[in-house]
Amino acid sequence: MKATLAAPSSLTSLPYRTNSSFGSKSSLLFRSPSSSSSVSMTTTRGNVAVAAAATSTEALRKGIAEFYNETSGLWEEIWGDHMHHGFYDPDSSVQLSDSGHKEAQIRMIEESLRFAGVTDEEEEKKIKKVVDVGCGIGGSSRYLASKFGAECIGITLSPVQAKRANDLAAAQSLAHKASFQVADALDQPFEDGKFDLVWSMESGEHMPDKAKFVKELVRVAAPGGRIIIVTWCHRNLSAGEEALQPWEQNILDKICKTFYLPAWCSTDDYVNLLQSHSLQDIKCADWSENVAPFWPAVIRTALTWKGLVSLLRSGMKSIKGALTMPLMIEGYKKGVIKFGIITCQKPL
């Protein structure tokens, strides 16, 4: 979601499980955040596509665009141009300054690259073209363009975000390397095999059809290209478990109404979807502890005089978002919400 320091060696990498109960059924309820209507669906664990009506999907796109049209300016004013979580040391009790939290957001990018295996000069040289799927106001794109000297293209549903991202690229003398446009992640306007790095930093949670989302990521990846998905998920279901507990789903439904998150899935679901495309080096990790300090920091910022004034000026969507933040913390603490990374490589 475009809203966001552990000893790297302490992180657990989980390869995909061939004995997963991929295919067992669970029931989901998709509530369109822009209306009181709901669409009842049945999905499978691993096949998590949401069979929403076309009108509901269009309402979702419009809702996401309007949400970020309204809230992105507030986020940039308070937190800067990286609209994603920071990466912290687990159980850190240090009260970081604003600059410390912004450094943690940069670390999130670096840790994601490290986890995906983009760690040495030889690997970095291979990255010539990057797509940032759900780019926000382009913080990741501009960082990656500078780091790799690569051509980066960011896509977002929000015209306000796309314009601001292009303006910032021009201001930072990066317009020749980083460009941004309004486009749908489920129907990307790019030819097959275009990008050496396919980057999705906290955008997957907005996708109503996870299978189509993954299919598009794979389609636009070049042979040998890396795919990095960093996203909010719900916990993995245990063996024999068909669905989340009702109280768990209730928390997710409330968050969905504010942040336009139509279909939660688990990291296991993502792994199985990627496995179905015969990708290589599929791995995932739970980084929930590494992002735990972030939402309390957002709340503390919102409760400052500057934060309150900015919230009121930004509008009702921002205010609703601030009021929903405690639910994110509750979900994390109760183990319902997980912050996951899933990476893989497309075969040559």
Swiss-Prot record:
Keywords: Acetylation, Chloroplast, Methyltransferase, Plastid, S-adenosyl-L-methionine, Transferase, Transit peptide
Region (SAM motif III): 220-229
Signal sequence range: none
A cellular-component GO term for this protein: nucleus
Record bears the keyword Transit peptide: yes
GO biological process, one term: vitamin E biosynthetic process
Top-level class of the enzyme under EC nomenclature: transferase
Pathway the protein takes part in: Cofactor biosynthesis; tocopherol biosynthesis
SUPFAM superfamilies in the record: S-adenosyl-L-methionine-dependent methyltransferases
Positions of the UniProt region annotated as SAM motif II: 193-201
Reported consequences of knocking out the gene: Slight reduction of fresh weight in mature plants. Leaves with high levels of gamma-tocopherol and absence of alpha-tocopherol.
Reaction catalysed by this enzyme: gamma-tocopherol + S-adenosyl-L-methionine = (+)-alpha-tocopherol + S-adenosyl-L-homocysteine + H(+); delta-tocotrienol + S-adenosyl-L-methionine = beta-tocotrienol + S-adenosyl-L-homocysteine + H(+); gamma-tocotrienol + S-adenosyl-L-methionine = alpha-tocotrienol + S-adenosyl-L-homocysteine + H(+); delta-tocopherol + S-adenosyl-L-methionine = beta-tocopherol + S-adenosyl-L-homocysteine + H(+)
InterPro entries: Methyltransf_11, MTs_g-TMT, SAM-dependent_MTases_sf
Extent of the transit peptide: 1-51
Subcellular location as annotated: Plastid, Chloroplast
Pfam families, per the entry: Methyltransf_11
Main function: Involved in the synthesis of tocopherol (vitamin E). Methylates gamma- and delta-tocopherol to form beta- and alpha-tocopherol, respectively.
Family per record: Belongs to the class I-like SAM-binding methyltransferase superfamily. gTMT family.
Record's protein name: Tocopherol O-methyltransferase, chloroplastic
Source organism of the structure: Arabidopsis thaliana (Mouse-ear cress)
